[in-house]
Amino acid sequence: MEGGEELFRVSSARLSSSNVWRNSAMDVFSRSSREADDEEALKWAALEKLPTYLRIRRGILTEEEGQSREVDITKLDLVERRNLLERLIKITDEDNEKFLLKLKERIDRVGLDLPTIEVRFEHLSVDAEARVGSRALPTVFNFTVNILEDFLNYLHILPNRKQPLPILHDVSGIIKPGRMTLLLGPPSSGKTTLLLALAGKLDKDLKVSGRVTYNGHDMNEFVAQRSSAYISQYDLHIGEMTVRETLAFSARCQGVGAKYEILAELSRREKEANIKPDPDVDIFMKAAWNEGQEANVVTDYTLKILGLEICADTIVGDEMIPGISGGQRKRLTTGEMMVGPARALFMDEISTGLDSSTTYQIVNSIRQSIHILQGTAVISLLQPAPETYDLFDDIILLSDGQIVYQGPRENVLEFFEYMGFICPERKGVADFLQEVTSRKDQEQYWARREESYKFITVREFSEAFQAFHIGRKLGDELAVPFDKSKSHPAALTTKRYGVSKKELLKACTAREYLLMKRNSFVYIFKMIQLTLMASITMTLFLRTEMHRNTTIDGAVFLGALFYALIMIMFNGFSELALSIMKLPSFYKHRDLLFFPPWAYALPTWILKIPITLVEVAIWVCMTYYVIGFEADVGRFFKQLLLLICVNQMASGLFRLMGALGRNIIVANTFGSFVLLTVLVMGGFVLSRDDVKKWWIWGYWISPMMYAQNAIAVNEFLGKSWAHVPPNSTSTETLGVSFLKSRGIFPDARWYWIGAGALIGYVFLFNFLFAVALAYLNPFGKPQAVLSEETVAERNASKRGEVIELSSLGKSSSEKGNDVRRSASSRSMSSRVGSITAADLSKRRGMILPFEPLSITFDDIRYAVDMPQEMKAQGFTEDRLELLRGVSGAFRPGVLTALMGVSGAGKTTLMDVLAGRKTGGYIDGTISISGYPKQQETFARIAGYCEQTDIHSPHVTVYESLQFSAWLRLPREVDTATRKMFIEEVMELIELIPLRDALVGLPGVNGLSTEQRKRLTVAVELVANPSIIFMDEPTSGLDARAAAIVMRTVRNTVDTGRTVVCTIHQPSIDIFDAFDELLLLKRGGEEIYVGPLGRQSSHLIKYFEGIDGVPKIKDGYNPATWMLEITSVAQEGALGNDFTELYKNSELYRRNKALIKELSVPASCSKDLYFPTKYSQSFFTQCMACFWKQHWSYWRNPPYTAVRIMFTFFIALMFGTIFWDLGSRRERQQDLLNAIGSMYIAVLFLGVQNATTVQPVIAIERTVFYRERAAGMYSAMPYAFGQVMIELPYLFLQTIIYGVIVYAMIGFEWTVAKFFWYLFFMYFTLLYFTLYGMMTVAVTPNHSIAAIISSAFYAVWNLFCGFIVPKTRMPVWWRWYYYICPISWTLYGLIASQFGDIQDRLDTNETVEQFIENFFDFKHDFVGYVALILVGISVLFLFIFAFSIKTFNFQKR
């Protein structure tokens, strides 16, 4: 049975104790108990008579008053479910185990067996392929070469140059049911790959050998993804859903597995044996194990034991929407799989961001469920505290892809003693295990003093384990195959989905409807935008201005119709972004087999139809009669129907683009390309008669062509157009002759052909959307990248050699003395603070001197305006105080820990001291070495390592440090000294092996979390600061990584700097590395400020001296103990106020005296003074910003290379579509075709540039906020660098486009005309790109920037002078024509090309006259137009720079 699968859950909510009989003062026994029992017995008897199907859907529910009634369990409401759980599990820690035992007892009583799964893996090897060294960096050059190389490899023309990268190497083992297995190993040891292999979820691109079996069955005999559950370390959720909704959706999709059958069998056997179960357990099991319920008791149970009840109805949130905390999100990821029926759980790093007590409670709940209900679990944890480690039965230790140990927890230390290594007393066993295989850390644990130490490789450990008694026993067990006949029939699932397809479609539809309600702002905004655009269009094409006398009048009407098509089509563009935003969670659910892709695709289409109806109705009702289209109700409704089809077709097309592109930049580029083809081939820009024969297929497949034909026929075959023009030579009506002149079929049936074709496209695009969802995988999978050093080191460690790594930046004599042990990105840890005295003296004499400074602060208070939500809850104060009178002193060479529970104000205090707060009210005094703190000078001598490691993604580690040092070290420091100093810092922070590694985006590519943390520290250190603040430098790291970072921090302190760290949950050895502690309690009050002492002796002595505080247990972590005894609950229980106790202590008086002493400047000292605000001159700042942007652009091929390729393809496409049209000047239509080519190119290339630059600027802006706060440069040099780097790329874009198109379209080859063509194209692309930058600079994020900019494109398009020439615009709108940038571009392009040509057209006017009469463009005005375009570019540049300088959207 999948019995209790939902019971594998977890907890953190501690509720007040009591059991069901103590829950109220009401007398439950007000009637005689016999009477109540008799009544209940009668109800049970009645229930027993029902057939099994009905019996397992009904139960006896006890009310709050103690009365019982029969209920249908599928209709329990939230309150009833909550009361039921309250009775079963009052306090999670205490009652969950009792409840599970009751459940198991009920099953055992009738002799039912629960299904169990034993997972075996034999000789499992997994290999990937990786590029090595600089070829792995994603530069524009490598990007192009790699595409060619992969293509030639595919054709077997070139050999594969990628290096094999072994991830797992010949591992074997058994995971037994009913036992908890802990998976440990340093980073990059293959933990995630092993878990994915066991869960049957390995990537298809990996080479896999060996086999994984469940109960002896191979993976192809059952559905592994549903028999087991893999819980990823990445938290991918839909931000707009609440926690409860997320879990309920998951439970609804996964179903109950075989539990329904087991429940039926249990009920049948109980009836036969005449056993009456506990009514509460009975109702819980029936409610949890019945199929197809939307609101399930399992969801409530999971929320309870995971401690998520407090945020059950809070939105999950994402980077744009505030929601639950990181720790709660992590628990939600765990809960999402636990509500399902899987019997085997593979959990990857489920404790990141959780404090140790929450982790303990969650693991303990899982353990209870695994032990009692015989589940199978493998859990990998980063930093398990000793008490959590002790919950496990078995340990698997992985290192370098090999198993070093697998077996009972009790024997693991015995194995390492057998190898000669002993775990020290004050060291967590888990931390010891992660370090003992590492080259850097192994020696300190060597216990055989009589023998000389020699590094023992992972392979040697692995071979020794085979000979160890545990290893031999494992080998013997593997030699005997699993007896398949013993496998429970319900253990392995063979059905692909958890519930029926109909039920899954209902679940997806309900969720999509919910998301549409939550995203209603987008739809309302689109309707407002459409209403606004309709108002402008109405007044521009006002019927009083619209005549029906000539074909030119027809052109204006056609312009209005074409614009309506464009507006309705582009209104669906938001679908593209909305689709891509939901893709990460979709891929997760799809791969976990929650639902088939079509069940997701169908609701996203069907539910949008009503919105389409409303949007199109708004447009048609507002514009149809006001513009003066054919006054016929039938034609009105036909236009309405047609535009509905267009909107649906466009939405389907954009969704398809999103599903094909899967990345916002690629999808935008790709989407623009398709749209361009659809529009150019639509028949308005280029008439059918002029389409080249090699492109005519494009005309016939363009949906826009069918829309254009149908909407034109609907209008021009009406009565108003049925007259013959007065001086016409033919007998054709005006409508027919106009349609013919534009290459449109003048046949009424074309309306229905067009509408039918559009409906066909609606179905086609939505079908292809579902297909793309089914078969494509997430975009940009993390690429394996190897440095040459890593390859050399891997090979050496296999042979058991020790190698020397690049000792760059050292003199030859120093290289000789300094025999470095090998270090790589994976083996970098040693005991925290393990620096020898010789090292220390060397470190203190770093190349650049600095002035040691102390910082003192007295009575610091910080408050913010009271949030509206709190005022609504009845808080009357105007301000909410977050810090209340905090005082202290931080001194050089002393490492201070800033600690407290979540919400105590640790980061707030740090931000206040560092001057990083952007709002709020600050009181109190802060002094630097006795002088009052001045923020301008302080920023020059202080470093601040933020918790979020924000760095430019496309530069290398060395370049990041170079940039920081260049801008922050004083001008006097020459280049050679600066480089030596950077090398020293890299040596200190152990970054030398990573010098050429790309930083990358967190969680996507580049550096690991721990390497990022060290880079953050190094970036601040190269500024040579005297004071460094670090916010949570070890959160999210495993024990070894945390030790590396803390050793880095300790090394920094030992150079004589003042360092302060906020820290969340330190292990014993990390806590021991600190010298002093400032402890805050919730509410921002201090409760201990002072030295820690050896092994925290001073801290322990202080707290144990307080009455009622329990003594610390031997070997217990002092940090954990201290947080437990000072918690709010503990403070209440003791009746103490720790703040008052501290303020009345001797310690407080000593601190006050120290603050007073350090607040007076030393006699020979002087206040900090710098002649300028920034270290470097304005010119140097500009050059540095330009240098960084150069590398950022060069290594960002999805932006730069794709843009150049896009331009190249567009140029070829335009050249072939408009082939030789520039030289034809017989008819007006010839000129309009050539002008159409200019119009569409300007619009598309421009909008494409503006759209793709936005995400790039948005990512760089977050880095800019950090760098500006650090005092590196002012806003102007940043804006300069950002704009200057665009110029060469724009020039390349213009040359590629200009030369190809100019030659192919056949414009006149004179130097002046060619120069003007390139000039106008260059400045047009420039102002569009600057416009994209500007919109990001004035908005908080790039989504809002995209919405705002797209609103303007629509207006610019309307007023550019192509759809409606200036001469036909009403007087009241002409002013907008003059401020529309595109109108000046078209003026320049058209007037410079055609404004001086004297050839005569078929209408007997010259080209020059036609251009002047139709557009009002004059050739001699071209020079002024050029100046206007330069002016527009300068204006946008100025707004961008001004906004970047003035607006700060980062709130702290």
Curated annotation (Swiss-Prot):
Q: Does the keyword DNA damage apply?
A: no
Q: Where is the ABC transmembrane type-2 domain?
A: 504-716, 1180-1394
Q: What is expression of this protein induced or repressed by?
A: Induced in roots by auxin, phosphate starvation, treatment with the synthetic strigolactone analog GR24, and colonization by the arbuscular mycorrhizal fungus Glomus intraradices.
Pfam families, sorted: ABC2_membrane (PF01061), ABC2_membrane_7 (PF19055), ABC_tran (PF00005), ABC_trans_N (PF14510), PDR_assoc (PF08370)
What is the recorded membrane topology of this protein?
A: Multi-pass membrane protein
Residue ranges annotated for the ABC transporter domain, each copy included: 152-425, 855-1107
Tell me which UniProt keywords the record has, alphabetically: ATP-binding, Cell membrane, Membrane, Nucleotide-binding, Repeat, Transmembrane, Transmembrane helix, Transport
- Tissue specificity remark: Expressed in root hypodermal passage cells. Expressed in stem tissues, particularly the vasculature and nodes adjacent to leaf axils.
Biased amino acid composition, Basic and acidic residues = 812-821
Q: Which SUPFAM superfamilies match?
A: P-loop containing nucleoside triphosphate hydrolases
- In this chain, the stretch annotated as Disordered covers 808-830
What are the transmembrane regions? 521-541, 554-574, 609-629, 640-660, 664-684, 694-714, 753-773, 1199-1219, 1239-1259, 1287-1307, 1314-1334, 1344-1364, 1375-1395, 1421-1441
Summarize the record's disruption phenotype note. Enhanced branching phenotype. Defective in strigolactone exudation from roots, and reduced symbiotic interactions with arbuscular mycorrhizal fungi (AMF).
The processes (GO biological process) annotated in the record are: hormone transport; regulation of secondary shoot formation
Where, in this chain's numbering, is ATP bound? 185-192, 900-907
Which cell locations does it reside in? Cell membrane
Name any GO cellular component annotation.
plasma membrane
UniProt GO MF annotations: ABC-type transporter activity; ATP binding; ATP hydrolysis activity
**SMART domains for this protein:** AAA (SM00382)
Q: What is this protein for, i.e. what is its function?
A: Cellular strigolactone (SL) transporter required for the exudation of SL from the root to the soil. The presence of SL in the vicinity of the roots is required for development of symbiotic interactions with arbuscular mycorrhizal fungi (AMF). Transports SL in the above ground tissues and is required for the control of shoot branching. SL regulates plant shoot architecture by inhibiting the outgrowth of axillary buds. Involved in the regulation of shootward and outward directional strigolactone transport in roots.
Return the PANTHER family for the record. PLEIOTROPIC DRUG RESISTANCE PROTEIN 1-LIKE, PLEIOTROPIC DRUG RESISTANCE PROTEIN 1-LIKE ISOFORM X1
What does the similarity note say? Belongs to the ABC transporter superfamily. ABCG family. PDR (TC 3.A.1.205) subfamily.
- Record-given protein name: Pleiotropic drug resistance protein 1
